[in-house]
Amino acid sequence: MKRIFSIFLSGIIMAGSVLCVSAQNDVDKKYDSYRESVGSEQATDTVELTPTSNNGKSYEFDIDVPSGNYNIFLNYTVKAVRTDTIKYILKINGECPFAECKNLSAPISYVEESRTFPKDTGGNEISGNLIVSNNAVSAPVCDSEGIFKGNYSFFLGDTSRKLTVEVTDGDIILSSVTLKPAREIPEYAEYSKNNKGKQEGGVIKLNAEHPDNRTSKSIFTFCDASGASVQPVAEDKIVMNALGGSQWRRVGESAEWKIDVPKSGLYELRIKYMQGYTNGRGVSRSFYIDGEVPFKEALNIYFPYSSKWKEMTFSNEKGAYAFYLEKGEHTVTLAVSLGDLSEIIKDCKTVLSELNTVYRRIITLTGVTPDSYRDYQLEDKIPEVIEAIGKEAQRLDAIVERLNKSQKGGTESGVLRRLSRQLKKFNDDPDKIAPQLTQFQSNIS
């Protein structure tokens, strides 16, 4: 029996992530298409590049590396905080390799001004002040919306000469970028096989109220006085003993803790949490060790709904996950993730992209302000578009069914159902398209 590596976060209060779907410009190549076009040649070397020029907002780096697929990491310090996150554009040879590179983001790291909570005149603890960390941050280039799980992989070859990072929002000093061979995250079965035979570890217990850094001030510390199960116990005075709350919900927001591992070995991970904000639905978090996801399943750790404090061991249907940790200092991180919503949102974006194409085809005949009483003969002139409308209605129905099965339907599934009904009306009677075109355009924009 493996020993337990316990993070007793004296509670983590979980909240769900926001389901937000919008269409992207389908003229640009998306990341999936980019990956299919560049192949899977693996890079072998880790390379750090320093800027050859910068004006405080745009940084250029000369690329001279062996051909292969790389993960890119930005190494920076924050000068001043004007926004919640750093926004930037990434280009290779003066062009964004795929559409998502036009809207990338990097986190701002916050730390406690003091590791001791201040107290009021009555001896009650007060949540401490958070300040921007002076430490350098190393952030991977990844999907800030959380739809693609893991870091983006970039192919750099003989024709790759220049990498440009344009900071569009935020005030940072970008000292370097690191190119690492693109990592293929293993399944747990492979990860476990590679660690087979390694000895069991000890017990590590850690309270949650003092994360070593967090990427949002929304991840705040507070007092839970519901009982003795949360440590330290709040009896006759207010004690800061819990972290998180209803505002810890934006995709990517994370909290990180340092741990001192007394001996190398296999550890289980147990967390005490409460998650009572999402009307019976569970939520998901991604789990990192030393900034890396140990195996694919850790990208989507599911926390079932629980309005009371509950201990949960990270596990699958076969039992608890066993994490291998070397002796010494490590970091463990929990970050908000979409979980199984990521594929649903990805499919929604595909449908909306197709419907925007449908809209553009229609207005070539009707114009943007069609005459509601005119017969545009759409069924005769663009029958393939009418057929596409029917197919997209079916795809929306399938998405709604998946949302409902995952218990994450809510208002989002209602919006999709209304759009599906409108599409079915258009498919059954194309004469209704022109009078309702403005509403249709609004629904898909």
Put a short name on every predicted segment:
Residues 2-3, 20-23:
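Intrinsically disordered, polybasic Lys/Arg-rich low-complexity tracts
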Residues 2-10:
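Sec-dependent signal peptide recognition
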Residues 13-17:
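Hydrophobic core
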Residues 23-445:
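Extracytoplasmic
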